Amino acid sequence: MKKHHLLLAVAAAFTLIQTAAGTVFAAAPPSVQDVSRMLRHSDGAVFPIGSYNARNVDHFTGDSYVAPLSKGPVPVANVTFVRGAHTHWHVHHGTSQTLLAVSGRGYYQIDGQPPRQLLPGQSVTIPAGARHWHGAAPGEMFQHIAVMEPVKGAWTQWFEAVDGQEFEALP
């Protein structure tokens, strides 16, 4: 229960992150109801799942959803990664990104470092300019709150997908 209150307090302190989440897929993405059912089997969903975001399908592997948590000067969102979905390698130029794990099991990796697991209640701040990726563990659901300070001139540069064999080899 303390984790729930802490996460609600953190979310209330920030606003929506306009994260680009999507995927290239052969079939329609799962419905919000289907994603809700899947999450109930992996610690449940504390925050809304939001809507499927196909705006940047070229920058994610697998399906993901984005839910705005508040409005204001600092963007904050809950991002739901469906069964192994994850971002491609990318860099946030001019601003850092903080990820707060909410449910399921995920990973992040900063280029040149080993992948690190993210579990509910854990957080990481990715430094500005650090090439990285983040998302669900192979075959598992994952949700995180993403927070980025809005900085004039900040932008995201996208790179290639994470190596599929290396990703699938994660424990």
Task: List each language-model region with its residue ranges.
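A short, N-terminal "cap"/entry segment at the start of jelly-roll beta-barrel domains
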Residues: 25-75, 88, 155-171
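Conserved short histidine dyad/triad with adjacent acidic residue
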Residues: 75-92
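Histidine-centered catalytic micro-motifs
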Residues: 87-96, 130-136
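Ligand-binding loop in jelly-roll beta-barrel domains
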Residues: 107, 128-155
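Short acidic-glycine-tyrosine-enriched beta hairpin
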Residues: 112-129
